[in-house]
């Protein structure tokens, strides 16, 4: 039905007719073209409006999340009759065509495309589709001179939604008024809430310059009147304040005060003109706009700009709404010009009369009136103010007739002074609603309307609240209805009930319609697209989804079985009760379907639609059969048995733990809430404050439910190891917040979590909690026992390379304003150079910062190329990195393999460390010895390099073990005298052990074999190859014990050029697990572990081959220190050790 009309000579004829969706505002706002308005809607009304464009805005996440809160996709027959009657359907194909053609003509009208062949065929963005024909609410726009509303019933404003803000309670839509239109009521479209509209694109005006001069003179005169009024009003306020401060009066009239501040018209104008920042900003912009055309003789105004100035002037200047409606109704441009000139003259006259009358009353009050007359004037003003205030805060009861009560009787809403109500309802039946109020609850100004609606409409149907809890909430509601607003308990209980009503009871948001419809392939693709690697985390989530899917399938089969059994029982009961009378049968059915413990409170919402909907729901609830009730109970039982997992992601910073939680919520289609626990030291932050305290609020868990608008969100408890309390064993004055988390994170207890503020149990079993931590050792043992720990290890540089190419670089290109991804070319060699030489971390946070710096430099180069200052090169070369990122880190591998001149190579051994940031590195242990000639028994050991107590104890153990094997002559030395000389050498040697990087604290037991080998190398004067690194704890008997961080240490060894690594034999199972995880093949894990049980000779070497192929490192295992000596120097020194083993074996 949308079509173009050719241009015609008659200016009043429109140029376009289209079918557009319509909407009627609830307020008295009049939208004038050219202005952007921020309009606040309730969440439901905004969702109802935007649901009509659901297929066009499906990619806007903010709108999609809002629509997911309401079930707009259910079948029409499943809804209540009244509810479906007022539920607008999606826009029709005629409206879609109309929006497309409106968009095309809008582009041509704005002059974006002079060639009609280049006009875009349809809107380019999602918000371009949100075009509406806004009907003014004529019922709320009243004109002092009574006139018929038929004159304005066909006028509409064509507006587009260009923005949206969600403040968790309301939705604020930004509407851009585009042009005016007239409805064609004779031609009815195929769908309701749509209409054929004549669009006003006319901008033909004869002699626009002279008409602008007339408008400009009037506007400038009005500007002077407004500025003068604001100056006078502010001067009156200043004089009054100074006189009140001095406490005396002046004889000068200007210093005696000004009665302008007592004038209601002056107060209203000043509040509109000066008290609003938005008006001040718009008013200044309007002045500048007129000044632009007045100051420059070269700037000539065109027809479009002139007509836009008319609408802008009328919209910004504080004209009444009925005057704005008149201007909106002027379709003819000449009529519009005459109307705005008349309005300007009227407004100028208002300011002139105000100034003139104020001058007269000031002269009479201060110069002619007596003291009694002045007192009477002030008393009359105060009396008028009191009557107005009483009229604003009180309202007479609608049920009391005017002839039955004094005209001056004031009745407060919601008190106990309401008239007695008959115990019989209108239809003659007994009323069971003991909480039913009068019609004052229907008033839009009733501050308890939302609470009343919740108590009467939603509370009885909440399945997760017990009857005792509902009874306590209703009891508090009765208390607030019977107490005056001035009572202190009134505000406390009102805030409490508002928070209770704001919790999204029984609302579950998910991507899938039911559990049995869960799409596992979609979830896998979503997780893989958001994160690279982390297969063990993804596997755990997929397992959870599989469990949900199977439970949904089993529940559906169980429901069918229950229905078949109950249908057989009902048939038997019907056959056996055939002789029962009709009245008795009806009476028995009524008592059978009615539940004794149910609380049924009639809905008393603000509209008649809500009344009818509530009655239909009550009828439905009364007609529930036992089969339906058993199905609902069974569904609830299955949901209760399905506990959401409580996962803790442990790993170094920057490894994607927080973003992984967001990806989990996205794949499940649930709302996501992040709660930062770092630094929390008060137990009330978790469990809430008790209502008796001033400013009491619920805890972060309940607040997260309110923000997410659902009872099954994904809540991320970020940095749970940074919470104050936990494993330090210190009693806190404000309680232990980590202990408060025990109930929240226990699946057996969080079904009845009690927040101190609410005071009743809340079911958290459907909430998916994900915790993140850097160090699990900082958590208390009871809390750690409740969490399912998943370790997120450090990334190797291959994984960082893929992450940088797929995720980090495209994101930084977009964030830094690069219009096209092809404008920055970073190949693998450059990215690998950045990873190895400019970042040393377990995660990718600094890596992303480095890529961001490169993008910013390239953005500067690109902007200079646009100004033709230089030529732009997209490719980033390795030689450019020092210019972009500065100097690289020092290469430790050169320090390892290049020894200083004349330095002793003996006593230098490479160890492996696990750093605090989650990465691995190589530590060089240096030992130097001095012999004291002539002094026997003067050996000593000095250790430097900020070594911790555990590391120094390991060094002492290693030195004692080396002394013991030399004293026992267990090493195969060539000369006996050499062995005796070694004993004397040890007894008289002063050993100094140093670990470089002295500013870094070092501690831990994993350097035991490294230190022991360093001492042995020093004593035997036998150097250790520099391409060997080792890690492991040593005992006094020479056993090598397992340690942690094997993967990170091997990666650090590889980055520093190490070719051979010695690790404890017991750590081989960790390498096997990492091998299966990296290859994503856990089928052979059991076989590899069985083969690993042979401690001396395992047969399967796939893990070792994997590490060699990936990093070029040969792995050696050590059960005893002798295995370390064998891996470093061979079997030559161990002949006596093998002989001693054979003797011990025969014995």
Curated annotation (Swiss-Prot):
Residues 561-574, 582-597 have a biased composition (Basic and acidic residues). Residues 395-444, 561-626 are annotated as: Disordered. The keyword DNA-binding does not apply. ATP binds at residues 651-658. InterPro entries: AAA+_ATPase, ATPase_AAA_core, Lon_lid, Lon_proteolytic, Lon_Prtase, Lon_prtase_N, Lonp2_euk, P-loop_NTPase. GO terms for molecular function: ATP binding; ATP hydrolysis activity; ATP-dependent peptidase activity; serine-type endopeptidase activity. Signal peptide: none annotated. It comes from the Eukaryota. Its EC number is 3.4.21.53. Residues 427-444 have a biased composition (Acidic residues). The active site is at residues 1006, 1049. Residues 903-1131 form the Lon proteolytic domain. The keyword Transmembrane helix does not apply. Pfam families: AAA (PF00004), Lon_C (PF05362), Lon_lid (PF22667), LON_substr_bdg (PF02190). GO terms for biological process: protein import into peroxisome matrix; protein processing; protein quality control for misfolded or incompletely synthesized proteins. GO terms for cellular component: peroxisomal matrix. It catalyses: Hydrolysis of proteins in presence of ATP. ATP-dependent serine protease that mediates the selective degradation of misfolded and unassembled polypeptides in the peroxisomal matrix. Necessary for type 2 peroxisome targeting signal (PTS2)-containing protein processing and facilitates peroxisome matrix protein import. Belongs to the peptidase S16 family. HAMAP family: lonp2_euk. This is Lon protease homolog 2, peroxisomal. It comes from Debaryomyces hansenii (strain ATCC 36239 / CBS 767 / BCRC 21394 / JCM 1990 / NBRC 0083 / IGC 2968) (Yeast). The lineage of its organism: Eukaryota, Fungi, Dikarya, Ascomycota, Saccharomycotina.
């Amino acid at each position: 039905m949308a079509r173009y009309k050719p241009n015609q000579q008659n200016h009043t004829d429109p140029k376009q007719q289209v079918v557009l969706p319509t909407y009627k505002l609830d307020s008295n706002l009049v939208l004038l073209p050219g202005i952007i308005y921020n309009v606040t809607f309730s969440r439901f009304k905004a969702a109802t409006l935007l649901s009509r464009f659901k297929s066009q805005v499906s990619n806007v996440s903010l709108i999609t999340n809002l629509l997911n809160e309401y079930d707009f996709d259910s079948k029409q027959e499943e809804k209540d009759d009244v509810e479906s009657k007022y539920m607008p359907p999606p826009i029709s194909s005629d409206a879609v065509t109309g929006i497309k053609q409106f968009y095309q003509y809008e582009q041509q009208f704005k002059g974006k495309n002079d060639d009609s062949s280049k006009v875009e065929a349809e809107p380019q963005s999602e918000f371009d589709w949100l075009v509406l024909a806004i009907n003014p609410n004529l019922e709320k726009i009243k004109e002092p001179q009574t006139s018929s509303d038929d004159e304005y019933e066909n006028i509409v404003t064509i507006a587009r939604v260009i923005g949206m803000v969600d403040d968790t309670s309301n939705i604020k839509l930004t509407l851009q008024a585009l042009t005016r239109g007239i409805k064609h009521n004779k031609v009815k479209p195929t769908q309701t809430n749509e209409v054929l509209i004549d669009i006003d694109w006319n901008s033909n005006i004869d002699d626009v310059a002279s008409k602008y001069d007339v408008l400009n003179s009037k506007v400038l005169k009005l500007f002077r009147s407004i500025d003068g009024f604001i100056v006078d009003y502010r001067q009156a306020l200043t004089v009054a304040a100074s006189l009140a401060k001095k406490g005396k009066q002046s004889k000068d009239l200007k210093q005696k005060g000004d009665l302008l501040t007592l004038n209601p018209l002056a107060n209203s104008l000043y509040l509109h003109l000066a008290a609003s920042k938005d008006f001040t900003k718009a008013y200044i912009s309007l002045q500048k706009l007129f000044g632009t055309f007045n100051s420059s003789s070269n700037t000539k105004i065109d027809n479009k700009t002139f007509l836009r100035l008319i609408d802008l002037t009328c919209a910004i200047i504080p004209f009444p709404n009925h005057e704005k409606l008149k201007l909106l109704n002027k379709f003819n441009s000449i009529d519009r010009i005459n109307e705005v000139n008349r309005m300007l003259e009227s407004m100028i006259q208002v300011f002139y009369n105000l100034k003139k009358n104020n001058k007269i009353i000031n002269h009479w009050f201060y110069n002619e009136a007596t003291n009694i007359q002045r007192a009477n004037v002030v008393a009359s003003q105060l009396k008028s103010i009191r009557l107005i205030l009483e009229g604003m805060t009180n309202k007479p009861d609608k049920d009391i007739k005017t002839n039955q009560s004094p005209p001056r009787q004031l009745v407060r809403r919601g008190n106990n002074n309401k008239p007695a109500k008959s115990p019989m309802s209108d239809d003659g039946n007994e009323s069971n609603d003991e909480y039913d109020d009068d019609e004052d609850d229907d008033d839009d100004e009733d501050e308890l309307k939302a609470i009343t609606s919740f108590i009467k409409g939603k509370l009885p149907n909440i399945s997760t609240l017990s009857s005792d809890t509902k009874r306590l909430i209703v009891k508090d509601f009765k208390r607030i209805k019977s107490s005056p607003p001035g009572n202190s308990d009134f505000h406390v209980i009102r805030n409490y009930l508002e928070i209770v009503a704001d919790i999204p009871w029984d609302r579950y948001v998910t991507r899938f319609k039911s559990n049995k419809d869960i799409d596992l392939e979609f979830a896998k693709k979503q997780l893989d697209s958001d994160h690279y690697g982390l297969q063990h985390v993804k596997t755990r989530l997929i397992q959870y989804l599989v469990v949900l899917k199977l439970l949904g399938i089993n529940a559906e089969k169980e429901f069918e079985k229950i229905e078949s059994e109950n249908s057989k029982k009902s048939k038997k009961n019907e056959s056996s009760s055939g002789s029962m009378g009709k009245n008795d049968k009806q009476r028995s059915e009524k008592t059978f379907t009615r539940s004794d413990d149910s609380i049924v409170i009639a809905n008393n919402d603000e509209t008649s639609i809500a009344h009818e909907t509530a009655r239909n729901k009550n009828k439905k609830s009364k007609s529930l059969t036992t089969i339906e009730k058993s199905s609902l109970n069974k569904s609830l039982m299955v949901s209760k048995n399905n506990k959401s997992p409580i996962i803790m992601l442990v790993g170094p910073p920057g490894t994607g733990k927080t973003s992984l939680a967001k990806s989990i919520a996205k794949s499940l289609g649930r709302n996501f809430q992040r709660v930062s626990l770092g630094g929390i030291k008060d137990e009330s932050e978790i469990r809430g404050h008790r209502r008796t305290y001033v400013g009491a609020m619920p805890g972060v868990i309940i607040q997260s439910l309110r923000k997410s608008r659902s009872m099954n969100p994904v809540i991320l408890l970020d940095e749970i190891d940074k919470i104050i309390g936990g494993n330090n064993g210190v009693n806190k004055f404000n309680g232990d917040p980590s202990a408060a988390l025990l109930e929240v994170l226990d699946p057996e207890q969080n079904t009845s979590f009690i927040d101190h503020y609410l005071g009743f149990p809340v079911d958290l079993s459907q909430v998916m909690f994900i915790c993140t931590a850097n160090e699990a050792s900082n958590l208390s043992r009871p809390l750690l026992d409740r969490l399912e720990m998943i370790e997120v290890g450090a990334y190797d540089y291959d994984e960082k390379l893929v992450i940088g190419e797929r995720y980090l670089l495209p994101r930084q290109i977009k964030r830094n304003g690069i219009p096209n991804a092809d404008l920055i070319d970073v190949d693998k060699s450059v990215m690998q150079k950045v990873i190895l030489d400019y970042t040393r971390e377990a995660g990718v946070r600094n890596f992303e910062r480095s890529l961001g710096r490169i993008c910013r430099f390239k953005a500067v180069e690109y902007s200079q190329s646009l100004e033709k200052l230089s030529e732009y090169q997209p490719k980033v070369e390795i030689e450019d990195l020092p210019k972009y990122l500065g100097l690289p880190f020092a290469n430790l591998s050169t320090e390892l393999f290049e020894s200083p001149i004349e330095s002793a190579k003996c006593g230098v051994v490479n160890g492996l460390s696990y750093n605090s940031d989650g990465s691995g590195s190589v530590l060089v242990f240096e030992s130097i010895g001095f012999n004291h000639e002539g002094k026997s028994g003067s050996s000593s050991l000095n250790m430097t390099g900020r070594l911790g107590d555990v590391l120094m104890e390991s060094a002492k153990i290693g030195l004692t073990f080396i002394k013991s094997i030399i004293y026992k002559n267990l090493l195969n030395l060539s000369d006996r005298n050499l062995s005796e000389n070694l004993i004397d050498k040890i007894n008289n040697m002063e050993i100094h052990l140093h670990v470089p990087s002295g500013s870094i604290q070092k501690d831990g037991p994993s350097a035991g074999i490294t230190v022991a080998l360093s001492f042995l190398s020093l004593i035997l004067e036998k150097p250790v190859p520099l391409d060997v690194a080792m890690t492991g704890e040593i005992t006094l008997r020479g056993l090598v014990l397992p340690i942690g961080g094997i993967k990170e240490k091997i990666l650090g060894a590889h980055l520093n050029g190490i070719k051979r690594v010695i690790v404890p034999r017991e750590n081989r199972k960790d390498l096997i697990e990492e091998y299966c995880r990296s290859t994503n093949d856990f089928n052979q894990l059991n076989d590899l572990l069985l083969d690993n049980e042979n401690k001396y000779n395992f047969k399967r070497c796939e893990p070792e081959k994997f590490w060699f192929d990936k990093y070029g490192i040969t792995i050696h295992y050590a059960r005893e220190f002798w295995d370390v000596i064998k891996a470093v120097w061979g079997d030559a020194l161990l002949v006596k050790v093998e002989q001693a083993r054979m003797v011990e074996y025969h014995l």
